[in-house]
Amino acid sequence: MSIDLQQDFFALFGLPRRFRVDEAALEMAYHDLQGQVHPDRFAHLPDVEKRLSMQWATRVNEGFRTLRKPLPRAQYMLELAGVDAGLHTNTAMSSAFLMEQMEWREAVEEARAAGEGHELTQLHHRLRHHAREVFDELERTIDERHDFAAAAEIVRRLMFMEKIQHEIDDALEALET
């Protein structure tokens, strides 16, 4: 068995380096690799081999977690492209997007304050639909235009949207208790 711990996750799973991932192929490759590197297969071997299998298993799990979800996958692709997305330091966004975020937050807060579970659920659905549209834009930006600087801005937008999604989930949970 030979797994190169230095290869990127796409190469590890035998996938092309694209934002759109064949989820079935990823899943199949993951299970195949897990079968090859599972620590139980190395239990009878010397400690060095056991540690190596643990490293391999960890790398496979990390790769799978990264590639199976669109936002971590996009962040990883930016990293591979050498683009510093400034995910935690660069919060500069267009004024239109910032206005949209304020409107989302106000709507969430109003629904939360009024105890409107139905309205929060509607906001949840609208935000998920909007996020799908933005993910489609991200896919085109990465896979077709190969514009990683623009992709970094889209990733930051999606991170804002993810925060609002969590706020809606928290508000719904608070109403249920």
UniProtKB/Swiss-Prot annotation:
One of its GO terms (molecular function) is protein-folding chaperone binding. Pfam families: HSCB_C. It comes from the Bacteria. Keywords: Chaperone. Residues 8-80 form the J domain. GO terms for biological process: [2Fe-2S] cluster assembly; protein complex oligomerization; protein folding. InterPro entries: DnaJ_domain, HscB, HscB_C_sf, HscB_oligo_C, J_dom_sf. SUPFAM superfamilies: Chaperone J-domain, HSC20 (HSCB), C-terminal oligomerisation domain. PROSITE patterns: DNAJ_2 (PS50076). Interacts with HscA and stimulates its ATPase activity. NCBIfam families: hscB, PRK03578.1. Co-chaperone involved in the maturation of iron-sulfur cluster-containing proteins. Seems to help targeting proteins to be folded toward HscA. Belongs to the HscB family. This is Co-chaperone protein HscB homolog. It comes from Aromatoleum aromaticum (strain DSM 19018 / LMG 30748 / EbN1) (Azoarcus sp. (strain EbN1)).
